[in-house]
């Protein structure tokens, strides 16, 4: 029985370690007084290197944010280089991936799994993630992080 507990603990620890904190910074257009991103976790990601995504597999992105606004609806968009929106992640109902309504000053987590398409070009990119109240677009959270896509 003790061996089973150790096995479960090791499995849980392995899952926790697989998703690492990513280096990120807030977007210029977002005010931390309105919404602050506290932590970004990406799998696969190594905190000592860039997050490296392999084509043809899924990557999971999770981030903690604290909105200072109340909203019953949230919309999210993922932007690639040159602020080009990803087709699959444009004006998506974010309430599918985090709790709605938001409450001012209450931390939340957004979890999303993204397929890394085989047609995406290899290279190192900065992407931007925006989350906002569609009824008041100045109420937004936003961060940027750098990833690498490889074969």
Curated annotation (Swiss-Prot):
Hemolymph (at protein level). Constitutively expressed mainly in fat body and also in hemocytes and secreted into hemolymph. Not detected in midgut, epidermis, or Malpighian tubule of naive larvae. Its main location: secreted. Glycans are attached at residue 58. Keywords: Disulfide bond, Glycoprotein, Lipid-binding, Secreted, Signal. One of its GO terms (molecular function) is sterol binding. Residues 1-18 form the signal peptide. N-glycosylated. GO terms for biological process: sterol transport. Pfam families: E1_DerP2_DerF2. Transmembrane segments: none annotated. Induction: Not induced in larvae following injection with microorganisms. Disulfide bonds join 27-141, 45-51, 95-100. It is found in: Secreted. SUPFAM superfamilies: E set domains. One of its GO terms (cellular component) is extracellular region. Binds to lipopolysaccharide from a variety of Gram-negative bacteria and to lipid A. PANTHER family: GEO08227P1-RELATED, NIEMANN PICK TYPE C2 PROTEIN NPC2-RELATED. Belongs to the NPC2 family. This is MD-2-related lipid-recognition protein. It comes from Manduca sexta (Tobacco hawkmoth).
